[in-house]
Amino acid sequence: MIGRVKRAYQRRKVAPKVRDGVVQKKHRHLATAALGFVVDRQSPAKGCRHIVTKRDIHEFTSIIPNWSRIREGLEGVVLTRGDDVDGLYRFYSKDRTGSIEIPAWDGDLWTVVTLEHFEEHRALFQRLAVPFEPKDGGIECRFTLPQAKAFLLLHVFLHELGHHVDRMQSKQQDSSRRGESFAEQYANTVSSLIWPEYVRVFGDPTRSAA
């Protein structure tokens, strides 16, 4: 909502959800590994809307290098209702699998983020040509729909995928030991690498900038 500083995409909010790839037990889980890679969609919470679609996820993963190998141990993606966390990687210890959650967008496309969050992601905001200005103790980012979708895919999704890669590269494959810094670096690296393919598949989000 315009006029207040919204939570930055910190990817973590409430216990007992996964924290840096460590298992949590709050929600029931039915293993879907036997079904292959599954993309599920929850109804958005009040005031939220899904910007990323199931088709977007399938098209986006098709341009990630070595996706068939990277997706090993990943059950799928859930497009969540969007009212509690900003993106999440869950690890299910019993099944030795994980899943990625991408939230519905909360409120207006124009959103105020913290200065810290803005600086951490300035390079991507500039690549997407997102207009911005200081407002209400933070930075108002004036996303268009294509820019918001690009941010969710090129950063939020890839960040959570980074936690999965981190876990799968660990000796026991039971936790994402390198944490947020590895996931952030992974997202930034892959985002830059696949940018030309992203534009080819989804169109250039900078053309929608005011």
Which role fits each region the language model picked out?
Residues 1-127, 134, 138, 142, ...:
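A metal-dependent hydrolase signature that marks the N-terminal structural subdomain at the beginning
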Residues 60-68, 161, 190-194:
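Hydrophobic, Leu/Ile/Phe/Ala-enriched alpha-helical segments that form helix-helix packing faces
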Residues 101, 205, 209-210:
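Aromatic-rich peripheral "rim/lid" segments of glycoside hydrolase catalytic domains that contact
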Residues 105, 167-170:
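Short strand-loop junctions, especially beta-strand C-caps/beta-turns
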Residues 109-111, 165, 173-174:
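Short catalytic/ligand-binding loop motif for oxyanion handling, primarily in non-cytosolic enzymes
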Residues 133-157, 170-175:
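Short pre-active-site segment immediately N-terminal to the catalytic Zn-binding motif
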Residues 155-168, 183:
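Active-site recognition of the HExxH zinc-binding catalytic motif
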Residues 176-206:
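Post-HExxH zinc-binding segment in Zn-dependent metallohydrolases
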